[in-house]
Swiss-Prot record:
Pfam families: UreD. Its main location: cytoplasm. It is found in: Cytoplasm. InterPro entries: UreD (IPR002669). UreD, UreF and UreG form a complex that acts as a GTP-hydrolysis-dependent molecular chaperone, activating the urease apoprotein by helping to assemble the nickel containing metallocenter of UreC. The UreE protein probably delivers the nickel. The gene is ureD. It comes from the Bacteria. The keyword Cytoplasm applies. It comes from Pseudomonas entomophila (strain L48). Belongs to the UreD family. Required for maturation of urease via the functional incorporation of the urease nickel metallocenter. This is Urease accessory protein UreD. One of its GO terms (molecular function) is nickel cation binding. Keywords: Chaperone, Cytoplasm, Nickel insertion.
């Protein structure tokens, strides 16, 4: 089935729909964007190759943000042996809603021997937002993954709390022969007790990892002045960080990535250029 055949026409909805599908392939030792297809304002810039074989791609969310009833779908397929690093130049903004829920669904399939680095900007939920996030990763044998997700509840830099609204966030990572990670976080009406009262929560996952990698990460986390922890679920390393300052949190995530990229992928760090702006 072609990418074009897989995308169904948008259905009638109070909001608008956007769908982006990307397929990465390896040719002569270099990862290429073998196919792309989009419906609506969910796009990618041209690929970058700052380190040779891996393909760096920037995913562009709608600049106007996400409002009531909007539906965004992102489907990423990595074929065997390919390596893609995906990030975003800006945050995903979910605005206040007095009506339908806004939906963001993200699907990632990692074929055998492929590598994905999913390093997006944060998802910001304005006070009163009604939003559903569903991120799922399917990891085949020999594939490698570095992925983080950051939720910003309200706009702490402006003193805005998340006092109203509801967030339903699901994160699933399926591993071959392992239970992986299946979790759900629901936040309603300003009740941030599940995250210790912190408006920012980040999850960083890496596989394959082992006890030695876990110990390296824990040593780095011990130096932080904000709550953080790490654990191993089989070969999956799961790191959690809480914060009140988004820039501080992003710096800590990037430091962890600088540690984990050589430890898990065997590659020297090559930060996306957007991080320097």
């Amino acid at each position: 089935m072609s990418l074009a055949q897989q995308i169904e026409p948008p259905q009638a909805d109070p909001g608008w729909s956007a769908h982006l599908q990307l397929r990465f392939i390896q040719r002569e030792g270099v990862t290429r964007l073998g196919a792309r297809r989009h419906v609506g304002p969910l796009l990618v810039q041209r690929p970058f190759y700052p380190e040779g074989a891996p393909c760096h791609v920037y995913v562009l969310h709608p600049p106007g943000g996400i409002v009531a009833g909007d539906r965004l779908e992102l489907d990423i397929h990595l074929e065997a042996g390919s390596h893609a690093l995906l990030t975003m130049p800006g945050a995903s903004k979910f605005y206040r809603s007095i009506g339908p829920t806004a939906h963001l669904a993200q699907r990632f399939h990692l074929a055998a021997g492929s590598t994905l680095e999913w390093l997006p900007q944060d998802s910001i939920f304005f006070n009163g937002a009604q939003a559903s996030l569903d991120s799922r990763f399917s990891v085949e044998p020999g594939a490698r993954l570095l992925a983080w997700e950051t939720l910003c509840l309200g706009r702490p830099v402006m003193g805005e709390r998340f006092d109203q609204g509801a967030i339903d966030s699901r994160l699933c990572i399926d591993l071959p022969g392992e239970p992986g990670l299946h979790e759900r976080l629901r936040i309603e009406g300003g009740r941030l007790d599940k995250v210790g009262g912190h408006p920012l929560v980040a999850t960083f996952c890496a596989t394959p990892a082992d006890q030695a990698v876990l110990e390296q990460v824990r040593q780095q986390l011990e130096a932080l002045d904000t709550p953080a922890g790490a654990t191993l679920l089989g070969p999956l390393l799961v790191i959690r960080l809480l914060d009140h300052d988004n820039q501080h949190l992003q710096r800590n995530l990037q430091r962890l990535w600088h540690l984990l990229r050589p430890a898990v992928l065997g590659l020297a760090p090559c930060p996306p250029r957007i991080w320097a702006t």
